[in-house]
């Protein structure tokens, strides 16, 4: 396995990560498409064991993956191994306006820790900035999800206490939001430890926009 060193933390992260969005079920299809069948936990355990045995140590999940069950399945599988042997990436996926209030977003983060069976997250992302919701444009939605409720500042506090080791964001949508967050980083308003973008042979649109001082993670690398 090839690894990259996170310059901020010294983490030795596998070049290939394990996305936990399409976990197998006990029926046909994955838990992303099939909401009726439960996740096949034994199969997930075996997949995680195989990945770790072959050098993969970065596992990416979210509260909304697999009909809301990905984090729990991920936590069950990973907790069977030493905590120091893997890195967990999850997200604040507060897409629904019901999750925008501060207490609801905080509760989402706390549930993530519980499901993942850990007291800290290695990599926490603001999930999919740049999109609109509930008739709001991208800026209004971003403000509702992270700024008006003070949740971004709260996440910074969690990082300062060690409950989040790296704070970043994933991006899809309005590039002006992407540029704004990079500007905040340059101005010292908020420090981003990493960003995650869609990057592959077809999608190179945002590669040059990345700040060279911020570690980059790519999703959808095979398309």
Which residue stretches match the model-derived regions?
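N-terminal binding-site loop/beta-alpha segment at the start of enzyme catalytic domains
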Residues: 1-86, 154
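Structural preference for beta-strand elements that scaffold enzyme active sites
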Residues: 3-5, 13-17, 57-58, 85-89, ...
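Generic structural signal for well-ordered alpha-helices
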Residues: 1-3, 48, 71, 75, ...
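Structural motif corresponding to the early beta-alpha repeats
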Residues: 81-102, 127-130
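Active-site mouth loops of central-metabolism enzymes
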Residues: 22-42, 92-104, 137-145, 173
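Short, acidic/polar
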Residues: 34-51, 100-117, 175-185
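Active-site beta-loop-alpha junctions enriched in small/polar residues
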Residues: 21-23, 62-64, 91-95, 126-129, ...
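Beta/alpha (TIM)-barrel catalytic core signal, keyed to glycine-rich beta->alpha loops juxtaposed to Asp/Glu
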Residues: 129-223
């Amino acid at each position: 396995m090839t690894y990259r060193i996170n310059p901020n933390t010294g983490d030795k992260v596998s070049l290939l990560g394990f996305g936990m969005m399409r976990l197998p079920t006990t029926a046909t299809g994955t838990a992303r498409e099939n909401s009726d069948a439960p996740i096949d936990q034994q199969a997930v355990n075996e997949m995680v064991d195989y990945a770790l045995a072959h050098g993969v140590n970065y596992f990416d999940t979210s509260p909304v993956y697999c009909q809301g069950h990905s984090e729990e399945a991920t936590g069950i599988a990973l907790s069977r191994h030493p905590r120091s042997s893997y890195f967990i990436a999850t997200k604040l996926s507060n897409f629904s306006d019901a999750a925008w209030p501060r207490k609801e977003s905080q509760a989402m983060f706390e549930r993530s820790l519980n499901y993942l069976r850990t007291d800290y997250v290695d990599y926490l992302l603001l999930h999919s900035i740049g999109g609109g919701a509930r008739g709001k444009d991208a800026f209004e939605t971003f403000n509702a999800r992270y700024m008006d409720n003070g949740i971004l500042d709260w996440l910074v506090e969690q990082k300062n206490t060690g409950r989040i080791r790296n704070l970043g964001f994933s991006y899809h949508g309005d590039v002006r939001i992407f540029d704004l967050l990079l500007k905040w980083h340059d101005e010292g308003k908020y420090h981003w430890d990493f960003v995650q973008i869609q990057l592959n042979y077809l999608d190179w649109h945002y590669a040059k926009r990345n700040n060279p001082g911020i570690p980059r993670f790519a999703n959808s690398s095979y398309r």
